[in-house]
Amino acid sequence: MALKQLSSNKCFGGLQKVFEHDSVELKCKMKFAIYLPPKAETGKCPALYWLSGLTCTEQNFITKSGYHQAASEHGLVVIAPDTSPRGCNIKGEDESWDFGTGAGFYLDATEDPWKTNYRMYSYVTEELPQLINANFPVDPQRMSIFGHSMGGHGALICTLKNPGKYKSVSAFAPICNPVLCPWGKKAFSGYLGTDESKWKAYDATHLVKSYPGSQLDILIDQGKDDQFLSDGQLLPDNFIAACTEKKIPVVFRSQEGYDHSYYFIATFITDHIRHHAKYLNA
């Protein structure tokens, strides 16, 4: 599958690149960002996938989070895809910021008119890793995932639905229980239909209750002054309770004074890179 390089910038000895390709799953052109650390010049490196939140593109993380130095030092290839298909000309895809374009919710839609293109779950877990493994110096056996908000939800569900696929997972202010929050209800009813039993297949709090897999070590940072926390969009307490019941360890850090923004992410990103490096470089 042909990759078209759109940009390449040297950063902390490595290269931050952006590529475009024709996605089979999403049936449109997709962009992704990839950071190749200095170590990638001489051998295969672990791959760490970042999933962004609502309204984001592949650009937000690479320009705002300040992750490059830590990724360079730990020798991690970091991949950041877009958050939805683009330019599919589906009626209503650009009408609201929390549904459609920029709001793929990392699921495979089953409802018309979304089901043909809105297959971000399969894109992130299957198509994109296959593309990365085939074209870049990464070790396919060493892969981890993290994300923010909608992308934190994505990172958690991708891990919980695929035991053993990812070595580690972490999240910043994830949407933990989407079947119960306004964002989730809107997205899931649109993409998955009105049968709420189908929604649980993409809800981290429900997935963790039946998680059969190997031991996970989950790291979550949550700003205490996050407006979406107080609005009931994120519901981390429900997820933590479910993890506690299943004896799955979660390090949940409530960060005084921090909000939902990339300033919050930038503050703690090095901790998250370190968390993943511990498992990826083991």
Curated annotation (Swiss-Prot):
Residues where N-acetylalanine is found: 2
Coiled-coil blocks: none
Pfam families: Esterase
GO cellular component: cytoplasmic vesicle; cytosol
Entry's Gene Ontology BP terms: formaldehyde catabolic process
Residues of the active site: 149 (charge relay system), 226 (charge relay system), 260 (charge relay system)
Substrates-to-products reaction catalysed: S-formylglutathione + H2O = formate + glutathione + H(+)
Superkingdom of the organism of origin: Eukaryota
GO molecular function annotations of the record: carboxylic ester hydrolase activity; identical protein binding; S-formylglutathione hydrolase activity
Entry keyword Cytoplasm: yes
Keywords attached to this entry: Acetylation, Cytoplasm, Cytoplasmic vesicle, Hydrolase, Serine esterase
Residues bearing PTM N6-succinyllysine: 4
Modified sites of kind N6-acetyllysine: 200
Stored SUPFAM superfamilies: alpha/beta-Hydrolases
EC number from the UniProt entry: 3.1.2.12
Keyword NAD part of the UniProt annotation: no
Family per record: Belongs to the esterase D family.
Assembly and oligomerization: Homodimer.
Free-text function comment from the UniProt entry: Serine hydrolase involved in the detoxification of formaldehyde.
Name of this chain's protein: S-formylglutathione hydrolase
Organism placement in taxonomy: Eukaryota, Metazoa, Chordata, Craniata, Vertebrata
The encoding gene: ESD
